[in-house]
Regions:
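Acidic, metal/ion-coordinating pockets
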Residues: 1-173
Length: 173
């Protein structure tokens, strides 16, 4: 494991995550984003472990959970009024599997206690993300959206979610 003085990995521990979220809130953070490297490679659906961890993080006060690792996109879920982006897909890899050539990135607009997240679908071509056509973008967002009715799709092929910031779900309060 990583320590203050040596490199390594930081395995998920709910108590430690709860403390970090609380510290962020106490220090005045207006938004808490949990970014995790988790999930099964090349699986288009989040596994039970991902779902459980993501729900715990939201329950403990995170505003957004963002995942990476699977090399493919996974679903989006609204849980207790907060978004979970299980896997964004690839950005710097250019693998031979066509499923790994699709990804999306997020833009967050923060206004007071409101957050609007815009999803921009991209294709990875020669290691470079290229915006998808509106039709392809709509198709990708439709794949992400069965778990998330709140995810709106624009004519331009982007997605949009709006939600309230702040800890409204913390079970420890």
């Amino acid at each position: 494991p990583a320590t203050a003085n040596s490199s390594g990995f930081s395995a998920y521990e709910e108590d430690y995550a709860r403390e970090q979220i609380a510290q962020a809130r106490e220090s005045g953070s207006s938004i808490v984003i949990a970014y995790l490297h988790y999930g099964n490679e090349y699986s288009r659906s989040p596994n039970e472990y991902q779902v459980n961890i993501s729900h715990q993080l939201i329950d403990n006060g995170a505003d957004i959970v963002i995942g990476a690792h699977a090399h493919v996109t996974q679903g989006v879920e609204m849980y207790n009024g907060k978004p979970i982006f299980y896997n964004l897909g690839n950005f710097i890899f250019d693998q031979s599997n066509p499923a790994t050539h699709r990804a999306y990135f997020l833009n967050l607009d923060l206004v007071e206690d409101n957050c609007t997240v815009t999803l921009y679908p991209v294709n990875i071509i020669n290691y470079l993300p290229q915006f998808m056509s509106p039709e392809d973008g709509k198709a990708l967002i439709a794949e992400l959206n069965p778990q998330c009715d709140e995810l709106q799709v624009s004519d331009a092929g982007t997605g949009k979610l709006t939600f309230k910031l702040g800890n409204t779900t913390n079970k420890t309060s």
